[in-house]
Amino acid sequence: LMCNEEVISFAEALLEAARPGTQLAHCYTSPSGALANENGLKICMQHRCGAPRLLAFDHNFMGRTIVTSQIGDIPGGRQGIPLSTQVDYLPFFEEQDPEGSLQRTMDLLERYLWRYPHQHSCIVIEPVQGEGGFVAAEAAWLRVVGERCREAGIPVWFDEVQSFGRTERMYR
């Protein structure tokens, strides 16, 4: 199902489109966004062995599997599901107050890094929150958050499944 000529051609075309200005060398195709996110989480957790927590943003949507429902900040999606994934939520970009929202995000991020040193397997970022109200974070805001996480050794994972194509250009 996942390994045929069409999928290979698609993956090669996607990498070619993504490569300018990036370090992308691999592509994984998935039949759904939730399964893509599950695999992304698995890769991050394997990369950061022993880091049981992850960082995500308020009002994010990850998918409808058991794990992605726990990460997503959609309360109804977690009803009746035992919580086994440790998620620390950060405030997302606010268009009406970019600088203030960045300060609030960075303050809480620093608190989590202090409180749970070396315990975050990744930070999951939707550059354009779909379920959260179609809120598009500014590139500069994303850059500051991502750079701080990279400084702390935390992989930065962009979940661009639902909002793909809503940015001005590919992988902006």
Q: Positions of the model-derived regions?
A:
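A glycine-/small-polar-enriched, mobile loop at the entrance of the PLP active site in fold-type I
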Residues: 1-8, 129
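PLP-dependent aspartate aminotransferase-fold enzymes
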Residues: 11-122
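Surface-exposed amphipathic alpha-helices with a cationic face
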Residues: 15, 142-150
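Loop/turn-to-beta-strand initiation segments
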Residues: 120, 153-154
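Conserved PLP phosphate-binding loop immediately N-terminal to the Schiff-base lysine helix
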Residues: 126-139, 154-172
